[in-house]
Amino acid sequence: MAQHTVYFPDAFLTQMREAMPSTLSFDDFLAACQRPLRRSIRVNTLKISVADFLQLTAPYGWTLTPIPWCEEGFWIERDNEDALPLGSTAEHLSGLFYIQEASSMLPVAALFADDNAPQRVMDVAAAPGSKTTQIAARMNNEGAILANEFSASRVKVLHANISRCGISNVALTHFDGRVFGAAVPEMFDAILLDAPCSGEGVVRKDPDALKNWSPESNQEIAATQRELIDSAFHALRPGGTLVYSTCTLNQEENEAVCLWLKETYPDAVEFLPLGDLFPGANKALTEEGFLHVFPQIYDCEGFFVARLRKTQAIPALPAPKYKVGNFPFSPVKDREAGQIRQAAASVGLNWDGNLRLWQRDKELWLFPVGIEALIGKVRFSRLGIKLAETHNKGYRWQHEAVIALATPDNVNAFELTPQEAEEWYRGRDVYPQAAPVADDVLVTFQHQPIGLAKRIGSRLKNSYPRELVRDGKLFTGNA
C-alpha cells in the first residue's frame, strides 16, 4: 500500500514517545501512520444476515477480512474502486452495509459486552450515524435510542443514514451534550460518549489532521470532555453502562478524563476492564482496563475506549431553566390505530408493540414507546419515523417507513431488474416488461424493499425522495 506524508508537530512526537507503552515500537507507529487507512464496512443485520451478505457479494470478487471486535465488520479490498465507488453499489444504496472505520466499531462492541442489553440508550455525539446505526442493529430496532448531534449541518446527514439503514427506534435531538445531565437525569440504561477530540488518530485518513495541533488546544478540548462526561454520567441510571471513546491518542483527552470522573465520584464509578472484549484486546489494554489503540497494533485508526458502570446515584444537577414548549403530537386512538395498521399492512408495512402511532395534523408517525418518558423533558428534532400523510383518498405512505417496515414477502412486492433499480435510484419512472397487477407496488431489488410505487398503466411512478436521487455511474456501470 502506498505511503503518504503525514505532518507531525515535534511536540506531538515527544508526547507520543512518552505515552506509548514500552512494548510498542515508535518506528512501527510512524510507519503505520504513513500508510493509508484500510477501508472497512459493517453489515447492517437489520436488513440481511452476515452469511447472506457474503453470499450476495461473493460474485464481486471483494476481499473481506473479518474485524476481530465486530462479527458483522470487515476490512474490504476491491479492484474496481475507481470504476464504482463503494457508496454507489446497490447494497449500499439499499442499506445492507455501512462504510465505517474499523476502530470506530469498538465503542458499541464495548457497550454491549458481557450480554449487556440496554432498553434506552443515548448516543451523545451521534453524526454521521455509524455508531447509532450499529447500536440500533445490536438492539434489533427494539427499545429506544436518543441520538444527539450538536452540529446543525450534521443532523440532516445523521437522519439520512438512519433512514437508509431502516431504523425505527431513534429520536434525534440537536443540543450541546452538556445539557443532558440536568435535563434527563438517570434516565438511560447505557450511554455512548464518542467525544469531540483533537483527532490525533485519524492521520492515516487525513495527513494534515495535526496542522492546528497544540498542547494548549488539547487542554481546552479535555476541559470540554470532562464537562460532557460529567453530564452523561448524571443522565445514566444507577447500574447503567457508560462508554467513553475518542479518535485521539494523548492521555489528557483519554485516561485522564476517565480518572477525573472517578476522582469526582469515587463511590459511583467502576471501571469495567475490556481485556476480554475480543481475542488480542490485551495488546491495547491499559492498567485501568481501557483500550488505548495505537494504529500499529491492529492496523487501523488510533482510538481510545473506556467502559464504566455507575454503581450508585449521585447528587442531581439544578433543574434546567429552559422551556421545552408544547409537544405537537397526540396519540392515535385505538380504533383509528387499528384501521391505519390494516391499511399499512395492505401495502406491506407492519410494526410491533415497540412503536406507537402519533398524529400531527395530517401526518402519522410511529414513535418508539421507550422514548415517551422523555417527552416534555427535551425538544426533539425528529422522533421515530413518519409513516404517512392522510388525504381524501387514504394515505400517502412515506419512503422512510417503507425502508424501515416493509418485508419483501408481501403479495404486492415487485422485483426490479438491475437496470430498472438503477432508474429508480435516479428518480425516474420505471417501465417493466410485465407490469404488476396491484396499484400500490412495493418495489424490491435483490429482494430488499427500496420504495413504494403507484402503478399507472404500464408505468411505475417513482416516489424516491428527491434529496436521495443519485446521478453518475451506479451499479450497472452505466452513467
Curated annotation (Swiss-Prot):
Pfam families: Methyltr_RsmB-F, Methyltr_RsmF_N, Methyltranf_PUA, YebU_pre-PUA_dom
InterPro entries, per the entry: Methyltr_RsmF_N, MeTrfase_RsmB-F_NOP2_cat, MeTrfase_RsmB-F_NOP2_dom, Nol1_Nop2_Fmu_2, Nop2p, RCMT, rRNA_ssu_MeTfrase_F, RsmB/NOL1/NOP2-like_CS
A GO term for molecular function: rRNA (cytosine-C5-)-methyltransferase activity
Keyword Methyltransferase on entry: yes
Binding site for S-adenosyl-L-methionine: A125, A126, A127, P128, G129, S130, K131, E149, D176, D194
Entry annotation: catalytic residues: C247 (nucleophile)
CDD domains given in the database record: AdoMet_MTases (cd02440)
Keywords: Cytoplasm, Methyltransferase, RNA-binding, rRNA processing, S-adenosyl-L-methionine, Transferase
Compartments (UniProt record): Cytoplasm
SUPFAM superfamilies to which the protein is assigned, alphabetical: S-adenosyl-L-methionine-dependent methyltransferases
Any single GO CC term annotated in Swiss-Prot or TrEMBL for this entry: cytoplasm
Function: Specifically methylates the cytosine at position 1407 (m5C1407) of 16S rRNA.
Family designation: Belongs to the class I-like SAM-binding methyltransferase superfamily. RsmB/NOP family.
Name of the protein this chain belongs to: Ribosomal RNA small subunit methyltransferase F
Organism, scientific name: Escherichia coli O139:H28 (strain E24377A / ETEC)
Originating gene: rsmF
